[in-house]
Amino acid sequence: MELTRYEIIKILMEYVTDEIVVCNIGIPSKELFKINDREKNFYMLGSMGLSSSIGHGLALSVNEKVIAIDGDGSVLMNMGSLATIGKTTPKDFLLLIVDNCAYGSTGNQETHSTCTDLYQVSKACGIDSIGVFNEEQLRDAVKLALSESGTKVIVAKARPHNENVPNINLVPTEIKHRFMNAIKK
């Protein structure tokens, strides 16, 4: 059975230790904040489609593992990011694409990932990719991706669902300064 985005993020965060995490805009960021708020989490509050690009840029400029959590709708909005990631292949970057075939933060309208296989697209861009469809596959893929160097993409199929979580109680400048201080330590 497919997991929800909240369940996928929760499982990912069970394995995160000191990695940098950049999370997609809207409800996914609120869900991550509820699951495991940490200084090395960057919560996107705007700029749909840029979580993968911000994570990619960080992965090229820091000497630690960077994880970007993105949704299918955001990746579809910025598909060029996959080609750029595939061309530059940072040494420690994981892009987790939660593919629920929906724009979750705006009411679960259907995305074009119903007819566009993001796993195949990321593979075609030259990225070491895996598609997962259940909890066991997700856990195995996350453990593998975090234990190896290189660039990896996990496309986790999910069922559309927005967890009822509170808003992030940090203002954008707080998020930025807290994050910047954490990654320069």
From Swiss-Prot:
Q: Which UniProt keywords apply?
A: Coenzyme M biosynthesis, Decarboxylase, Lyase, Thiamine pyrophosphate
Q: Which reactions are catalysed by this chain?
A: 3-sulfopyruvate + H(+) = sulfoacetaldehyde + CO2
Q: How is the cofactor bound?
A: Binds 1 thiamine pyrophosphate per subunit.
Supply the gene name: comE
Tell me its EC number(s), please: 4.1.1.79
**Cofactor(s) the protein needs:** thiamine diphosphate
Supply the name of the protein: Sulfopyruvate decarboxylase subunit beta
Quaternary structure annotation from Swiss-Prot or TrEMBL? Heterododecamer composed of 6 subunits alpha and 6 subunits beta.
Any one of the GO BP annotations: coenzyme M biosynthetic process
Pfam families of this UniProt entry?
TPP_enzyme_C
Explain what the UniProt record notes about the effect of disrupting the gene for this protein.
Cells lacking this gene are partial coenzyme M auxotrophs; they grow poorly in the absence of coenzyme M and retain less than 3% of the wild type level of coenzyme M biosynthesis.
Q: Which PANTHER family match?
A: SULFOPYRUVATE DECARBOXYLASE, SULFOPYRUVATE DECARBOXYLASE SUBUNIT ALPHA
Q: What Gene Ontology molecular-function terms does this entry list? A: sulfopyruvate decarboxylase activity; thiamine pyrophosphate binding
Task: Say which family it is in.
Answer: Belongs to the TPP enzyme family.
Instruction: Tell me the function of this protein.
Output: Involved in the biosynthesis of the coenzyme M (2-mercaptoethanesulfonic acid). Catalyzes the decarboxylation of sulfopyruvate to sulfoacetaldehyde.
Pathway where this protein functions: Cofactor biosynthesis; coenzyme M biosynthesis; sulfoacetaldehyde from phosphoenolpyruvate and sulfite: step 4/4
Q: Which NCBIfam families match?
A: sulfopy_beta (TIGR03846)
- Keyword tRNA processing recorded: no
